[in-house]
Regions:
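Low-complexity, glycine/proline-biased repetitive segments and flexible coils/loops
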Residues: 1-196
Length: 196
């Protein structure tokens, strides 16, 4: 799976769970904040995290859950899509994150970093884009086959405050954007800190 993102300090602690692995063969999709990815077999999809993502659907070609909706269920072709993620404009423009992975057989990944399920005859799925919290698509993984399900996307921590409140005291080299409708936006894609 991808890496969790954690925001803590001043008595506040928030964890954004990363996207899950894809399901493989008869194994269920792995759990993740963006919901489980598309299962490659009849077992259940991965579990989403309350307030962050929906569950993946059950069934061989089912999609994984996204941040805004559950995955689409199906035990036959065509493979089902992963649930879409949620759009946020905290950075000044709309960006969708935490999409669910598509079901095996080429099911499309949900909007927001979910990757497609593996096409028939292709047992591997791609890693999710970094800092999206998306979930990887499902694979078939029949008996005796070696399969590789992609990693879920790592998360991101974004802070927004009035320009007049920004102290400039940061570590970890976050991206800093000022003048975003009168606000300063800090984007952390790795370890770092901000002191007001």
């Amino acid at each position: 799976a991808g890496n969790n993102s954690v925001l803590s300090g001043g008595g506040l602690s928030l964890t954004s769970i990363a996207g899950g692995f894809g399901g493989c063969g008869d194994a269920p999709g792995r759990s993740g904040g963006a919901g489980g990815s598309g299962g490659g077999g009849p077992d259940g999809g991965g579990s989403g995290t309350s307030g962050q993502g929906f569950d993946g659907a059950t069934g061989g070609n089912s999609g994984g859950g996204g941040a805004s909706e559950a995955g689409n269920r199906g035990n036959q072709t065509p493979a089902k899509a992963g649930g879409d993620g949620l759009s946020s404009s905290i950075t000044g423009s709309a960006v969708t994150r935490a999409g669910g992975g598509g079901g095996f057989g080429g099911g499309p990944g949900g909007a927001g970093g979910g990757t497609d399920g593996a096409p028939a005859g292709n047992q591997n799925t791609a890693n999710c884009p970094a800092n999206t919290g998306g979930a990887s698509g499902g694979t078939d993984g029949g008996t005796g086959q070696t399969t590789v399900t992609g990693n879920g996307g790592s998360g991101v921590v974004i802070l927004s405050m009035p320009d007049s409140s920004y102290s400039g005291n940061t570590t970890g080299s976050p991206t800093v954007a000022t003048g975003v409708s009168g606000r300063t936006v800090l984007t952390f894609t790795g370890s770092g800190s901000y002191v007001s």
